[in-house]
């Protein structure tokens, strides 16, 4: 970071303990490795027998090797603790990650809104062409004073002020279309109990 932040006392103490652990573990590895190298050196004169000295050197090398392994494991644990410390306390990085994710979601929402608007316009154009074809055909029995479905649709859309208003249900429009279709296919009543179609003079 370009600017060093002022840490609370507890965090400062924790970082100091991490630094001390790092130095102690590295020193332990270096000292034990140095002693292992010294033990490997063959000396000419011994106060004890050569077999006894060999067993002693073997035991010392095992102990110092175990110390090196233990210091290495402590360093790995220190790395894990440092990662956890950064994750839990590096708030600027966390906030930056959150802001980037929010920006990605906003971009995705804008793209979805544009696609929905384009889909709405395509549906409206197709609906207008279908209505023009239907009302100009000889099968239309609708009242000329009735509004076409496309005009009803656009009247509804003219009241929408945001992309969220695209969720207006089309059920009333479809119900009106089904009513018009039923008027075409419903035969006149011939039993005298219902009103038939008006005869043309």
From Swiss-Prot:
Record-linked Pfam families: Med22
CC annotations in GO: mediator complex
GO molecular function terms noted in the UniProt entry: transcription coregulator activity
Lineage: Eukaryota, Metazoa, Chordata, Craniata, Vertebrata
Gene Ontology BP terms: regulation of transcription by RNA polymerase II
Function: Component of the Mediator complex, a coactivator involved in the regulated transcription of nearly all RNA polymerase II-dependent genes. Mediator functions as a bridge to convey information from gene-specific regulatory proteins to the basal RNA polymerase II transcription machinery. Mediator is recruited to promoters by direct interactions with regulatory proteins and serves as a scaffold for the assembly of a functional preinitiation complex with RNA polymerase II and the general transcription factors.
Transmembrane annotation, as ranges: none
Coiled coil: 93-123
Top-rank lineage group of the source organism: Eukaryota
Chief site of localization: nucleus
Protein name according to UniProt: Mediator of RNA polymerase II transcription subunit 22
Keywords: Activator, Coiled coil, Nucleus, Transcription, Transcription regulation
InterPro entries: Med22
Region (Disordered): 182-201
Listed PANTHER family: MEDIATOR OF RNA POLYMERASE II TRANSCRIPTION SUBUNIT 22
Description of how the protein assembles with itself and partners: Component of the Mediator complex.
Compartments in which it is found: Nucleus
Family, as annotated: Belongs to the Mediator complex subunit 22 family.
């Amino acid at each position: 970071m370009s600017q060093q932040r002022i840490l609370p006392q507890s965090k400062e103490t924790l970082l100091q303990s991490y630094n001390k652990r790092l130095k102690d573990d590295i020193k332990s590895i270096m000292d034990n490795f140095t002693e292992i190298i010294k033990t490997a050196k063959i000396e000419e004169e011994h106060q004890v027998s050569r077999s006894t000295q060999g067993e002693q050197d073997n035991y010392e090398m095992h102990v110092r090797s175990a110390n090196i392994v233990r210091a290495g494991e402590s360093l790995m644990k220190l790395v894990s603790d440092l990662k956890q410390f950064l994750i839990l306390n590096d708030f600027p990085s966390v906030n930056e990650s959150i802001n980037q994710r929010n920006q990605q979601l906003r971009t995705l929402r804008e793209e979805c809104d544009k696609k929905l608007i384009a889909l709405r316009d395509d549906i409206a154009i197709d609906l207008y062409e279908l209505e023009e074809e239907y009302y100009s055909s000889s099968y239309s029995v609708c009242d000329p004073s009735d509004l076409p479905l496309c005009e009803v649709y656009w009247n509804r859309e003219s009241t929408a002020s945001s992309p969220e208003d695209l969720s207006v249900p089309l059920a009333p429009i479809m119900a009106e279309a089904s009513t018009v279709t039923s008027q075409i296919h419903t035969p006149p009543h011939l039993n005298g109990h219902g009103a038939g179609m008006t005869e043309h003079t």
